[in-house]
Amino acid sequence: MDIYSTLSHEKENLVPINENRINMFVCGPTVYDDAHIGHGRTYVAFDTIKRFLEYLGYSVFYIQNITDVDDKIINRSKETGISTTDIAKKYEKRYIEDMNALNVNNVNLFARATDHMAEIIDQIERLIEKGYAYETEDGVYFEIAKFKDFGKLSHINVDELQSHRELAKSTKKNKNDFVLWKKRDDPSEPRWNSPWGMGRPGWHIEDTAITEYYFGSQYDIHGGGIDLIFPHHEAEITQMEAVSGKSPMVRYWLHTGFLMVSGEKMSKSLKNFITIRDLLKDFDGDVIRFFILNKHYRSKIDFSHKVLVDAGKGLERIKKYYELVSGQLADKNSNATADYELVSNTKKEFIDCMSDDFNTPKAIASVFKLINESKKDILDEKLNESELAAIKGFLDDVSYILGIDFQQKQDSSKDKELFDLIADIRTELRANKQYELSDKIREKLVDLGYEISD
């Protein structure tokens, strides 16, 4: 199993700290608004990564943080007059609903920042004790000059840095020192008591406090969008390795590529984003997920409705093939031993692709290759029970790994509309004394397994 790590800029063999246990952390949402499809791209990718690692036999514990205290939440509260707590609760709930719609349901623990304030304060205290952080009149800052490896993830030259929007404070020793704790006097804003007075944590310290509490100072995989490499993930490494004295903090850093719209990155700041919730009005969650997985997680994705429509057509091919195989197998001995050389070769190809840095597009291509090479024989009923069972078993594995249900979904509301239409047609036929045609329609419906009573 080879994984591309942003830290080394090369593929590395997966060697967990503990032999069969993998601890994985992915930066979760700041809950002040609905998640957009760019967020969905990241979380579908890591959900699939966990699924495949578990398929290989690893035990994976996956944590995602929830940033429920942040300037964006506070600003939204001031705009709407709704409390920061209620805003965070509302959008956390909606985020979970959106993830469930995309079948992203393998996170073992959602860790809220506000539930880990003691751990955050403790980590800041230890950074001060070790000489890496200092207090000013407006907060506590990490002194990056004290950490010689700052920039090793992003490969950014510290001397050439422009002051980041969140970090520009005149009270800092260096313009690039980043905030660990923000002192706040305004009682209308969320704040907690600390050794440095009332205030709230900076963004970066939340994640390292959470991961240290659950995983210790070193763990296996940290993931997120490529836009988080700097300053966020760089700051995480700086904090954790400084406070623990251990390196590396994380063995494998994985980052998803941008989702693009008309050549620009999809983002809320550019106001060119499409929420998952809105997209689900036009496309099934399985189609959205299939669209995402048709690109490698590290590559850019160009978003358009046409690409989603095309993804839907591709997924429909797989679903119809699965239905064909399942139907023929049901007519035979569905408990037959699975054995088919074509499937064995395809399965090896699929696993090899996924083992090469989770290459989902190539893995999916192997499934279409199987369809192309076997469908005619299935239609001609040339495959025996064991061969059909092998195909179905493989497709069931693929379904689990990709997190996509290959069974055709029945839309009961549309079914009712169709049957009402058929009933109206038959009523009109009988009124015109076309009894033979009406009865023929009835017989065909019965043959298809529907109960019709006149």
Where are these regions (language model features)?
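Alpha-helical recognition segments enriched in aromatics with Gly/Pro capping
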Residues: 1-32, 47, 118-326
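N-terminal, positively charged nucleic-acid-binding surface of large information/translation enzymes
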Residues: 8-11, 17-103
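Short phosphate-binding/catalytic loops that engage adenosine nucleotides
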Residues: 58, 132, 450
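Short catalytic-loop micro-motif centered on adjacent basic/acidic residues
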Residues: 62-63, 107-111, 222-224
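Short, polar/flexible loop-turn hinges at active-site or ligand-entry regions and domain interfaces
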Residues: 80-86, 107, 298-302
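N-terminal, positively charged, Ser/Thr/Ala/Gly-biased leader segments
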Residues: 97-133
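Structural preference for alpha-helix termini/caps and helix-kink/transition segments
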Residues: 265, 271-454
